[in-house]
Amino acid sequence: MAKSATGRGRPLQQLQIVADLIETPTLARIYAHTEREGPVTVGELVDELGVPQGTAYDYVQRLETAGLLDQVTESRPSEYDTEAISLTLSVDGTTTTVSPALVAAIARTDTDDDVDVYVERHGLDGLAAALEYAFERVDETVSHRIAARELDISPLEAEIVLQALEPVAAAYSDPSG
């Protein structure tokens, strides 16, 4: 198995790339797609995500250098797979965990206007909160009206964002429970 220079043991470098994932939807799309479908080649990322080839190579290299992607084959074309992300931030008593599911939700801002508009209105913290309700909605433990009340948004906006995030919540739901 091929080994690459990674960011393991360099938490601040990994923090920087996680910040980049949060701020760069295309980078988040590459990570999220590789996490769900990996191992993948750069060519597959280009074809399946419609990302320009130069961008795909650059972003794969950035993720690999930070230790979030690993080259898993020595043969050409190289295949890459992900390392799990789990970064918990606590600010002023509010805790948020950056997980593969949240990265996948952020990635949707690049391809889903409803998610993009929601982030414009409520920010990434609002998206993280809405994603938690999307998980509960997939588990059928919450309605859009309850989510609307608790997120302090209209029932229509709650329904729209929960529907937009449902594929992410369904893909990352714990099948055991």
PLM regions and their residue ranges:
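Haloarchaeal acidic low-complexity proteome signature biased toward cell-envelope/secretome components but also
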Residues: 1-177
